[in-house]
From Swiss-Prot:
EC numbers, comma separated: 1.1.5.4
PANTHER family xref list: L-2-HYDROXYGLUTARATE DEHYDROGENASE, MITOCHONDRIAL (PTHR43104:SF2)
Catalysed reactions listed for this entry: (S)-malate + a quinone = a quinol + oxaloacetate
Annotated keywords: FAD, Flavoprotein, Oxidoreductase, Tricarboxylic acid cycle
Disulfide topology: none
Name of the gene this protein is made from: mqo3
Record-level GO BP terms: tricarboxylic acid cycle
UniProt similarity note: Belongs to the MQO family.
Gene Ontology molecular function: any one: L-malate dehydrogenase (quinone) activity
Name of the protein in question: Probable malate:quinone oxidoreductase 3
Pfam families found in the cross-reference section: Mqo
Cofactor(s) needed by this chain: FAD
InterPro entries documented for this protein: FAD/NAD-bd_sf, MQO
Amino acid sequence: MSEANHKNIVVVGAGIIGTSVATMLSKVSPNWHIDMFERLEGAGIESSNENNNAGTGHAALCELNYTVEQDDGSIDASKAQEINEQFELSRQFWGNLVKNGDISNPEEFIQPLPHISFVMGPTNVNFLRKRYETLKTLPMFDTIEYTEDMETMRKWMPLMMENREPGHQMAASKIDEGTDVNYGALTRKLAHYLEQKSNVSLKYNHDVVDLTQREDGKWEVVVENRETKEKVTKIADKVFIGAGGHSIPLLQKSGVKQREHLGGFPISGQFLRCTNPDIIKQHAAKVYSKEPQGKPPMTVPHLDTRYINGKQTLLFGPYANIGPKFLKFGSNLDLFESIKPYNITTMLASAVKNVPLIKYSIDQMIKTKEGCMNYLRTFIPDAKDEDWELYTAGKRVQVIKDSEQHGKGFVVFGTEVVNSDDNSMIALLGESPGASTSLSVVLEVLEKNFADDKEAWEPVVKEMVPTYGRSLINDEKLMRETRRETSKNLHLNR
């Protein structure tokens, strides 16, 4: 591989996205030096931490919001195919890191687990049936099973069917090739790999407090040691901001044009966590349902088997909780300090247009554990208060922006990548399915920020992600070969 010119690259944030970007960049060339800064005392403590998310390997197997019913009644599965392909790219990357010995023991961060969709009521049952009929014709999803039979559902989800009253129309679909992913464990493995690299400097307890672009296009990045309060300035050719909820404030400090007409609304996730081992062992799947009518996709409830530190556990949620912090370990001033003259009209327009979202968030905020338990009983009729505890998980910041298609104050559900005009800065904003599609973010960083260095990075990418540049959606043989290989590398055939 030919060497690229020397580059100084700054990566902000040591979560799953930041460590993924830094890992790939570190492999491209020894002449590329990466300074990585994390404001907390270790990697993967905020949103990537295993206790702060549901750990779904988002592959559109059970998440119903990725398949959309059209006006004519047909199902558009194009988004589901896109998400599935993106997750396959991530699996290739992780699998080859294991194969090359860069990280080890994949069973510590990924486990095979069926993904199930479960709905009630004639309208939702009709939707799920049509979704099944559509997905069954697509090679990516052709192992999907469907049932409206209660006894079959009892085999798939025994805990959910126990003492459930008959008479309600129900349906379920299942794909066995799903996964539970411990993104915290994976992030820590990537960080450990980076700590051994000679061309990477990874510093914890270091906060990026300012970013200024010089006339020559380089960036001055001011970093504060949170323990000593000492500040240093790093000069960077490229900057990647993968700081979770802190990405919007950093983007604002950078002064790039793309910060305008852009804001964020912070939401905490709360989960019920089962504390009874006898209950936990009765369920082994991720079960997603359909969001209540008129509610945003973030309201989709799910019952998740999790594998954390070698132990099986069980979560239900999420329940939203609003508050001004952009990070779990953030400041109560975060939201207010993010409102600027250049985005206040965007924020106000969003407040007017999204009354149902605000009402939902307030309703969730005042919901007691009793209210949360009542919701859980739509999934587990026999759920007992003493077997579950309510806890606050991670923060996400819903991106609000102006859009030609949707007008002012549009709320973005999903992941948003923002590039400066000269592609010297990129910031990742938003929420799910970000972690699952982390490799797609890596590829976007390379393609947009390092287009002039393609000769250096393309061979590395093709080594780590063999299907790069080819379609898994349109090439069934390649898709099946890739799945077999990644399943072997990640020890999923167990």
